[in-house]
Amino acid sequence: MSAYIQFFIRYNDSFMPIGIYVRSSHIYQYFDEYTPWEKIKVVTRPLLDKIRDDVNDDILYFQKRYDRAKEMKEYVVTMNNSMDEKMEWIENIEATLGDCCEEIEKAEYVKHYLSFLDDIIESVEYEDNIDHKNYLYVGIEVGNPTVNDIVR
């Protein structure tokens, strides 16, 4: 069974979904450790900053891995092995390069989504009522949340 992470905007006491992502998505993977199950919690700038740091760390990791694979590919060409062995090495390295590019692209997508959420937070006009100050929420397997589902 696949779990879903959902994002909501609060309007009075109702919650309008603005995004839903399956467990295999990068959005889910980055938000998972910070998100309650069957409850919702407010999405704050500090939370987005933590996740952005995680994403940037992953991008840096995959960029370094990509650079190392490129260096290895250049080295393999100069090795004294058979052509078949070289080609096998190069094919494996090419797969690694492709995987790194794919992971970087997915992480960049998450960064864009974080910017989208930042824009929502920035554009809201806060009211004096504390219940309406926190208007962007996230939860896993929450269905149709109510104010009783909010984790404070």
Protein language model features and the residues they cover:
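Acidic (Asp/Glu-rich) sequence patches and key acidic residues
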Residues: M1-R152
